[in-house]
Curated annotation (Swiss-Prot):
Pfam families listed in its UniProt record: Methyltransf_9 (PF08003)
Xref: PANTHER family: TRANS-ACONITATE 2-METHYLTRANSFERASE-RELATED (PTHR43861)
Keywords: Transferase, tRNA processing
GN (gene name): cmoB
Its EC number(s): 2.5.1.-
Enzyme class, UniProt record, top EC level: transferase
Homology family: Belongs to the class I-like SAM-binding methyltransferase superfamily. CmoB family.
A GO molecular function held by the record: transferase activity, transferring alkyl or aryl (other than methyl) groups
Protein function: Catalyzes carboxymethyl transfer from carboxy-S-adenosyl-L-methionine (Cx-SAM) to 5-hydroxyuridine (ho5U) to form 5-carboxymethoxyuridine (cmo5U) at position 34 in tRNAs.
Binding annotation for carboxy-S-adenosyl-L-methionine: K96, W110, K115, G135, D157, P158, T159, I190, E191, M205, Y209, R324
HAMAP family referenced in this protein's UniProt entry, alphabetically: tRNA_carboxymethyltr_CmoB
Catalytic activity: carboxy-S-adenosyl-L-methionine + 5-hydroxyuridine(34) in tRNA = 5-carboxymethoxyuridine(34) in tRNA + S-adenosyl-L-homocysteine + H(+)
Assembly mode: Homotetramer.
Protein name: tRNA U34 carboxymethyltransferase
Length: 332
């Protein structure tokens, strides 16, 4: 295991000691050791070398409550700013954000801040909570959770470029912001987690429709929550009643890995059957071309290329265009 990985994982293990999640230490270190030996991306070591080249800076201000903004342009000289931007661009494509680092605007494909603005008013206060973000991407929402006062934020996502992007951002925060010791990313899926039944809040945003067995996935989310804990689920939905579920064909909006798109009523039934209560649909929103688009930080195809050019209410395959719902529920 490289020095960087060892440091990242050890920091996570240390934060779990004497916490409600301490029993995770019975399995987690061995799991991460196996990951390091058998599952690392071919580019991973190169990415780590690039991370090591990021300069150490001293951001004078960090804002995680209204954005993810680390420092200002005036904190660094022009050469250092260009060096930082050049290195961060080596980790493209940047899909989830945006981030602001010493005056550099990482203009990501998704305006994840807009999603957070739709979700945040409807959830329990995160202050003092242990939070799990399943399918955390590059960690944008994790930082916002920390900014809301969460005691501990753990993100899980098997995509290793997201893992690297998260640590690129953390590199600029870790030495200037004490709570950064309480935010950790583990390169794994929820299916690799033992049922901890210990998190106060579990987020899963943009994952359910990628699962062949959505009921099993929802059960896995439930298994991570303590009794009374809160689930925040965001996913693609379709219009209809409690019997309506769209199973996409080979592709949906050019994505091959989309399986089930339920109506909000059907999704409510699923959650109820699995033992959730206080289930409420708090937001339904059509994804716009301003919220998901190509940028200089993600310069390949995006949403506009996946919709019918003659009718943007339909995907290029003829399905209803992406509509996303946020559902909040509690474990009985």
């Amino acid at each position: 295991m490289s020095k960087l990985e060892q440091t990242w994982f050890n920091e996570c293990y240390t934060s779990l000691i004497d916490s409600p999640l301490a029993h995770w230490l019975q399995t987690l270190p061995a799991l991460m050791d196996t990951w390091q030996r058998t599952a690392k991306h071919g580019e991973f070591d190169k990415w780590c070398r690039l991370l090591n080249k990021l300069p150490n800076t001293s951001p004078q201000q960090i804002d995680l409550s209204t954005s993810v903004t680390i420092g200002a342009k005036s904190d660094v000289d022009e050469y250092t700013q260009k060096q930082i931007e050049g290195l961060l661009r080596q980790f493209m494509p940047w899909r989830k954000g945006p981030f602001h680092v010493h005056g550099i605007h990482i203009d990501t494909e998704w305006r994840s801040d807009w999603k957070w603005d739709r979700v945040a008013p409807h959830i329990s206060c995160l202050k003092g909570r242990n939070v799990l973000d399943v399918g955390c991407g590059s960690g944008y929402h994790m930082w916002r959770m920390l900014g809301e006062g969460a005691n501990r934020v753990i993100g899980v996502d098997p995509t290793q470029l997201f893992f690297i992007q998260f640590h690129a951002i953390k590199q600029f925060i870790r030495n200037s912001y004490g709570p950064a010791n309480n935010i950790h990313f583990l390169p794994m899926g929820i299916e690799d987690m033992q049922p901890l039944q210990a998190f106060d809040t579990v987020f899963s945003m943009g994952v359910l429709y990628h699962r062949k067995d959505p009921m099993a996935f929802l059960q896995q989310l439930k298994d991570q929550l303590r009794k009374g804990g809160e689930l925040i689920l965001e996913t693609l939905v379709v219009d209809g009643d409690e019997t309506t579920v769209l199973m996409a064909g080979e592709r949906y909006a050019q994505m091959r890995n989309v399986w089930f798109l339920p109506s909000t009523d059907a999704l409510t039934v699923w959650l109820s059957r699995l033992g959730f209560e206080n289930i409420r649909v708090v937001d339904v929103n059509h994804t716009t071309l301003d919220e998901q688009r190509s940028t200089s930080w993600m310069d390949t195809q995006s949403l506009k290329d996946f919709l019918d050019p003659e009718d943007i209410t339909r995907t290029i395959e003829g399905y209803p265009a992406p509509q996303r719902a946020v559902i909040v529920a509690n474990k009985k």
